[in-house]
């Protein structure tokens, strides 16, 4: 079967296909792609570098994990030349299917690719045009993201042949996002094993670090949940909520309803399942859109930036999915994103999904207990490196697996199990990680890949050579600060040693990974000007010009280009150890930079390359080891002389980014204070830290404590501030679980909370000058000011605030009372605009005691008109002493019982009468900032002007009346002994008819507002029945005034028009 066909025309499939386009954070000019994550705006102080934790928003519990994640992002796993062919586009259609010779660098899970043919076309450094073209080509690599990729190896059983008639061997099939699929073919078995091991290791470390991040995330954020004890208990409950799901990376998100069902059996092989429905109406299993029946891994996805940790809710499930009930399960990567809820933190949402999901598939020790041991392969923290170690394994550790014939048929899960077996055996011998370094420039470097990662050697997470030319770097006397580059002239003895050297590694054709002398040969430091590296023993390092180093500084770059494999000194090279390279020293004890200056301009050879005859010879598509040796082509790419010109601005690292140089190189200066001894001096948790004298109380939190203890053993004490360290080393007994009475614990889900709070605050500010308390309320009963008033507070304020009728608070003319609320016994004290007259027991109308006359100068007033009213009737004046208003302190009511209401009906004592629901109406709703606004009440006229008094209710046509004082507690004289009953709104029909200005002298008082005779039609509608009230007996006639408000009061001489 042939899958590769087409004409001989070269098609740039990598550049033309959108699936291989560079991500948005890559590309651009060569120098502008270097992104430095400056987390502080402070000026750099060499004597006291700023701690990363002082400017980083990340909690200290997550810093060790984020350090390892970013170290993995910038790790250079492997590099070399191979052939690539894109088989399918992102939509599943056939691509160009043309082989292309590329030079690739695997950085983390990003595979950067350059067209090897284009790189070889511009080998003349003396030509300015070539330099410009080479810069453009080198600055725009193509990236393939392998984070969620699926790998499969091809062998003879696949029966895939090329156009030359030979089987496709030493090839990998890579399926990435959407439906993109690529074929990667390597020159020989050794190269294939090296690349296969590197890609498998990078995927294993990526998933393992994501699981460790999940453990650290639950440990640091889970303690903030108030019911974390209940959530971690071993109890089975179903989880139901709306989520967004996508099946595979790059697929569209679909909103569905997720139901996590727990297993009813405790056996090992019985799991629950996650059912996904299109809606929350039909949640039966036969209506499920998809069902996750098994999960091998489940973890929270790190959002690539520390600032997004608390807002990201993406979860990845690696398992088996059924889309139909009768079909077999398919292995899929499912991404689930629980929907966020208002006023609920994102970490709360994701943790409440993670724990039940782990329980249903019995992952990581759940539902019994989260495993925190780094020796247990089922733990979230299995094999986690201990800082300063930053990697799980070396690529060479996986070579025995790739050399095995059986590994050709392993699935991704089987590869993970075999890699875990290797790591477990090493951990049993005291293994703590690899690639130790004390030159970690920052625990939180930039997640972006730039020119420093692509073309420059990084001893640690990022190369310290980025600080060349920085004043702060040159002035720092720390051993990690490298001096400025200077041209080094070799002595004659050194030249003789190099001429006489005959390194056996030059003749070696195997890749550098199989050499057991140094596990770090892939990462041998090179000069900043020559960033594409070839190591000792590499097939790419065949010596073309065994000419000794040039001794003159005036030699041209082409004369100074030498072979990379020639040692610095053949006698001292044998004593060089990886540890000395890690410490920044060579075998002779000198700085690496001094030795690297001798070999900074070397030629890069690309062996087994075929791009010179790419368009003529089809057979060159086959790179079988037998035929490829006969047609092997070696093309030199003298990149070193070109890149040397870009080591300075604007494309090099001596020119800072926008802003001060101190900000640009801040994270590199921090490396001077992070020594290896500081990393090992971290204090970890002990069981006594969490006991606090009560072990049973914190038994459930032991899972989080164990995770925190393991994470804090990573040794990052030097990057934490004192306050953060104290907080980490404290016990969980001091963790706030949401029981404090602070603002964060308020019930934000109360729909009336915000409205009440705003109303109270606005009305208090509005009436702070008008409300003079008549009786001081004790501090214990003062209002909380948060929109919530205790019951006792309401009662005492209602009684004491209006106890006396003889004192009236001073009222400012520009802020008068609200007439609509006068006489409303259900208005809450905290929400009324005016508290001068309310229907408390002191505000009831007072009648003389039976048998006793009323003094001639005393009048009973029930309504106080605001001052400055343009009215000819002087009896409504604010200071009219003849009225006997409450402003006259000498006016007193005669002793005796109070009148029991507007109709003076006798009523049995101690009987509470609740008004009919339709007898009341809602209070006037005031929007903040406008005390006279009508709010959202329909068809309601605006509030009265402060200097306008409404007409009596009875004279307002077809207007509903407000509640009156008939439903008083008859056991106490005049009204309620405590708080008023709750307000009950009713359906009220408002009108907008014009109102008459003021009551006529024959109209009844507006104070009493009795209901009309409901037995008679009122504007076309019949009202309620009102029983007649008994008349007063033995009451003496009061002196009749010719005018005044008292003429409308019932007496012996004046009949009450509403008594019948």
Swiss-Prot record:
PROSITE patterns per the UniProt record, alphabetical: PH_DOMAIN (PS50003)
Gene Ontology cellular component list: cellular bud neck; cytoplasm; nucleus
Biased composition (Polar residues): 490-504, 845-883, 900-923, 931-942, 1048-1060
Biased composition (Low complexity): 465-481
Gene Ontology BP terms: signal transduction
Basic and acidic residues: bias regions: 571-589, 801-814
Keyword Transmembrane carried by entry: no
Residue positions where Phosphoserine is found in the record: 491, 510, 518, 538, 556, 871, 885
Sequence ranges assigned to domain PH in this UniProt record: 75-204
Localisation per UniProt entry: Cytoplasm; Nucleus; Bud neck
Keyword terms: Activator, Cytoplasm, Nucleus, Phosphoprotein, Repressor, Transcription, Transcription regulation
Repressor in keyword set: yes
GO molecular function: protein kinase activity
A Pfam family reported for this protein in Swiss-Prot or TrEMBL: PH
Region of interest (Disordered), residue spans: 465-589, 801-942, 955-1060
Gene3D superfamilies registered for this protein in UniProt: Pleckstrin-homology domain (PH domain)/Phosphotyrosine-binding domain (PTB)
Family: Belongs to the CAF120 family.
Extra remark: Present with 1380 molecules/cell in log phase SD medium.
Subunit structure: Subunit of the 1.0 MDa CCR4-NOT core complex that contains CCR4, CAF1, CAF120, NOT1, NOT2, NOT3, NOT4, NOT5, CAF40 and CAF130. In the complex interacts with NOT1. The core complex probably is part of a less characterized 1.9 MDa CCR4-NOT complex.
Function: Acts as a component of the CCR4-NOT core complex, which in the nucleus seems to be a general transcription factor, and in the cytoplasm the major mRNA deadenylase involved in mRNA turnover. The NOT protein subcomplex negatively regulates the basal and activated transcription of many genes. Preferentially affects TC-type TATA element-dependent transcription. Could directly or indirectly inhibit component(s) of the general transcription machinery.
Name of the protein described by the UniProt record: CCR4-NOT transcriptional complex subunit CAF120
Organism the protein comes from: Saccharomyces cerevisiae (strain ATCC 204508 / S288c) (Baker's yeast)
Gene that encodes it: CAF120
